[in-house]
Each structure stands twice: as structure tokens, then as C-alpha cells.
């Protein structure tokens, strides 16, 4: 069966033919390639076409596809363990590794996804503070938990949906919407609701309205407000953890969060998530405290092995991050140069190995309102052009591109050559 045949048959058994909406390429007006295999930065579809991958499973594969050490760990572990639903040495080893090597992580709880991590962190914050309201920011995506699906960015923003059907108003009445990088608005929000706010959750580097780094004075304001009103500050590092730096986006700010959520890279390509923070807070979780959260597959031994292999390799090879930064800068500089030479309105935001192309006339993109000015029709033309040229990029103006340690100057040069042809065609 070829790509089209597989995808058409998939529609008979899965809504839209996919298990996550953005994969269907609906907004791009085309069918997606059906991926068969991947190694390094190269993926192959069922038609045999190869692509240089800048999606990397939506971020987890910093080491590239099927890294030999990660695959070895999975194979060796699977000979003796699939799942137990019981304590294992592997979950101790990964938990200890993260507590000893990350900032502001005294205790950790393993879960199975980023959504589980963020929803559980919010529940814990509510249980710890005894308060109900949370603040999230327009354009930030924290998973498909009901209380987060307001102004959520990601696929919700791509499809122009304000939220989601099936979410009753009661589920979101305790969710307050902040404006990213707007100190005045967040002060007013706390002035009105501060004594009811349990937590503020934020992507310190947003990745689901495109890549936007929070201003340092804005993050400091959040910390100060949380301290003043007795709320917890939660950093959602599902995307940025181990990516923008080994210790995550925390290293970009001189600010300590109370709780941090992780996923993606920490699972080495397998389903994984975690939330972590101060011992005093984490011990409110059952069985120590009264905040109940559980999971049959949490701490799964194969996932723990993949995660430990991934994070150990990243820690022991710090030059990986230098190379990703070098490739990211080369790509960013090249895109800007080509756009200027061809009078193509473009802003390229980048933090480490994640970046976004914003097709806009603005001089900078720093807020959710800025993002909404982007030319989505031009993005669609860009997307189709690059896919045809053999590059796998996210089918959304509002998602990040990701680099891995396996991307080379040759890969970047090929991407820039293809982008130049697009820019010339846009004249």
C-alpha cells in the first residue's frame, strides 16, 4: 500500500485518519506522508521518499531517530520487563538522575505524557495552596486537559478554534487568561483575583504559538506576584526541558519555579512525562499527602530505560548543545539573509535548537497578538514547497522547527537552498 491508500483506509478506522489532529494536514489542504522508518535526521514514507526531518516527533528526538544507545537500552530492558505496575530500580535511577542534575528538582513523579504532567501539577498546586483558580497565557498550550483549552495555541490556534466542544463552562471557570509578556495585564489579574489563584503555569519559551521567549522582567513579575499572593509558579518545560539547554529554559532566567513539568526528550521517543519540584510541595501527593494521582503505566521500565539512556548521553556530551546552537544560528542567519535579499517579510525567532518562521510585516514577534498577524496563506505555500523539496516541517505556522544533534551543515545548506527557491517564487 502507498501513502494515499494507507491514509484513505485509516480514515475508516480513526477519526480523520490520525490519532492527533495536526497530523492529518487538513489545514494545509493535502494528505500527509505516511512514515515508515527513520534514522538520524532522515525519515522515509511508504512511497519510498526521503525527508530531512525538522519535526523530530514534535521535539523528543534531540538525539535523532533510533539513536543506537537508546535502542540498545530499550532492547535490553524489554528482554526482562514490559510492565509490572510495581516499583523498579529503573524508575529510581531516572528519578535520582533528574533530581541530582536539574535545578529546583527535589522530588519527582513520573507520568505518561505532557498533558498528564501539567494537569497533575495544577491539581497538586490546588491541593497545596487550598485555592482553585489558575492562570495560563493566551497562545500557550499545556495539553488537552479541559481547564487548559482556552486560547490554547498549537493545533487549536492552527484551526482557528477558540476552545473545544465537550468542555463545559464549569471546567474552565477557574482558568484565568493572562497575556504573554504583558506585565500590566498580569498585575491587574492578580489585583482582582490574587487571593483565589493557586498557580500560574507558563511556557518560559512558548513553542505552540511559534517560538517566543518570555521577557526576563515578565518572568520576574510572575515570581514576585506568586510570592506576594501565595500562588505557585509552574514552568511547563515539556518542550524546552533538555532542549534549549540540558537543564532547560530555567537556565535562561534567574528565577526559581515551584513546580516544573517535563516530557518529550526525557522519554527518548517513548511516551513519558513527569512533574517535579520542592519536596515540601511534592509530598502533598498520595501516598504521602492527600492529592491523589496514579497511573498504571507510570514509571514503565522500558520508558525509564530509554529516558535514562537519552539523558545520560546528553549529560556526557555537552558539545551536543554547542553544535545544535551552531546549526540553529546558521539556519536562522541564512533564512533572514535570503528573506532580505528577496524582500520577503519574515521574522525568525529562535532559542537554541527550536525556531519558528513568522511570515509577517512586523519588526518583531513577542506576543500572542503579534503571532495572529502572520500570513497563514504564505505559510501554506512555504510548507507545500518544502515538503515537495524533501523537508519534513510542522504543518502549522504556530509550531516550532526542531534541530537534533545529527543535523549537519550539509542539511542546513540544503534547507536554505530550497527556501531560497521558495523566496524567489514569492516575488
UniProtKB/Swiss-Prot annotation:
Its EC number is 5.4.3.8. The modification N6-(pyridoxal phosphate)lysine is found at residue 264. The keyword Isomerase applies. GO terms for biological process: protoporphyrinogen IX biosynthetic process. It comes from the Bacteria. Its main location: cytoplasm. InterPro entries: 4pyrrol_synth_GluAld_NH2Trfase, Aminotrans_3, Aminotrans_3_PPA_site, PyrdxlP-dep_Trfase, PyrdxlP-dep_Trfase_major, PyrdxlP-dep_Trfase_small. Its cofactor is pyridoxal 5'-phosphate. The keyword Metal-binding does not apply. Coiled coil: none annotated. It catalyses: (S)-4-amino-5-oxopentanoate = 5-aminolevulinate. Keywords: Cytoplasm, Isomerase, Porphyrin biosynthesis, Pyridoxal phosphate. One of its GO terms (cellular component) is cytoplasm. Gene3D superfamilies: Aspartate Aminotransferase, domain 1, Type I PLP-dependent aspartate aminotransferase-like (Major domain). Signal peptide: none annotated. Pathway: Porphyrin-containing compound metabolism; protoporphyrin-IX biosynthesis; 5-aminolevulinate from L-glutamyl-tRNA(Glu): step 2/2. Belongs to the class-III pyridoxal-phosphate-dependent aminotransferase family. HemL subfamily. Homodimer. This is Glutamate-1-semialdehyde 2,1-aminomutase. It comes from Clostridium botulinum (strain Alaska E43 / Type E3). The gene is hemL.
